[in-house]
């Protein structure tokens, strides 16, 4: 039986145990594919499936707005003046920061959670791939620290994929260790890139 990590709840009017998400979505349901990001209001729920990629959630508890990204690599090298891409951690964070600036809310009032960075390859394969999961994790932690964000929780590393659900209304994030069969059920719709 796979290990299910604990949920990381924020204050919520929902009286169900924090380990089970609400049965019905409150509004817009968004699925993030690798390289996607989304920022929304209290009517938004954001889902994704992570392997070695990392997701960062940013949430404002009073305004009930927030976003999540799903990045593949820590940074792009070299950056040739191309438009920002959610495929890279530093650029995905900049895309979310643009949305936060548009709200007029102070950045330091947002709360962060870090999820993902599983080692999906054998140790000798990781050496050949420059250990992408570790670099992704280091990048996420560095950005949160540099921006002065409050880090509420992290669920990083390991060797199993994760299913993630972020409810912007409550700030709750549910994380489930995934099985291969579940990964094949990912929606094929696209969001922002």
Swiss-Prot record:
<protein>
    <recommendedName>
        <fullName>Probable chemoreceptor glutamine deamidase CheD 1</fullName>
        <ecNumber>3.5.1.44</ecNumber>
    </recommendedName>
</protein>
<dbReference type="Pfam" id="PF03975">
    <property type="entry name" value="CheD"/>
</dbReference>
<dbReference type="InterPro" id="IPR038592">
    <property type="entry name" value="CheD-like_sf"/>
</dbReference>
<comment type="similarity">
    <text>Belongs to the CheD family.</text>
</comment>
<dbReference type="InterPro" id="IPR011324">
    <property type="entry name" value="Cytotoxic_necrot_fac-like_cat"/>
</dbReference>
<keyword id="KW-0378">Hydrolase</keyword>
<dbReference type="InterPro" id="IPR005659">
    <property type="entry name" value="Chemorcpt_Glu_NH3ase_CheD"/>
</dbReference>
<dbReference type="GO" id="GO:0006935">
    <property type="term" value="P:chemotaxis"/>
</dbReference>
<comment type="function">
    <text>Probably deamidates glutamine residues to glutamate on methyl-accepting chemotaxis receptors (MCPs), playing an important role in chemotaxis.</text>
</comment>
<keyword id="KW-0145">Chemotaxis</keyword>
<dbReference type="GO" id="GO:0050568">
    <property type="term" value="F:protein-glutamine glutaminase activity"/>
</dbReference>
<feature type="region of interest" description="Disordered">
    <location>
        <begin position="1"/>
        <end position="26"/>
    </location>
</feature>
């Amino acid at each position: 039986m796979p290990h299910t990590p604990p949920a990381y709840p924020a204050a919520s009017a929902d009286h169900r145990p924090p380990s089970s998400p609400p049965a019905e979505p409150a509004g817009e349901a968004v699925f993030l594919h690798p390289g996607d990001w989304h920022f929304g209001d209290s009517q938004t729920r954001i889902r994704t499936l992570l392997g070695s990629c990392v997701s960062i959630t940013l949430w404002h508890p009073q305004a009930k707005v927030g976003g999540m990204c799903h990045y593949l690599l820590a940074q792009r090298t070299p950056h040739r003046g191309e438009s920002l891409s959610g495929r890279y951690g530093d650029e995905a964070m900049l895309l979310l920061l643009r949305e936060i600036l548009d709200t007029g809310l102070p950045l330091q009032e947002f709360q962060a959670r870090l999820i993902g960075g599983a080692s999906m390859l054998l140790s000798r394969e990781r050496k050949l791939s420059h250990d992408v999961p570790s670099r992704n994790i280091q990048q996420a932690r560095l950005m949160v620290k540099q921006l002065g964000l409050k880090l509420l929780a992290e669920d990083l590393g390991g060797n199993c994929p994760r299913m993630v659900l972020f409810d912007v209304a409550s700030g709750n994030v549910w994380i489930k260790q995934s099985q291969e069969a579940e990964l094949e059920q990912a929606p094929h719709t696209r969001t922002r890139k």
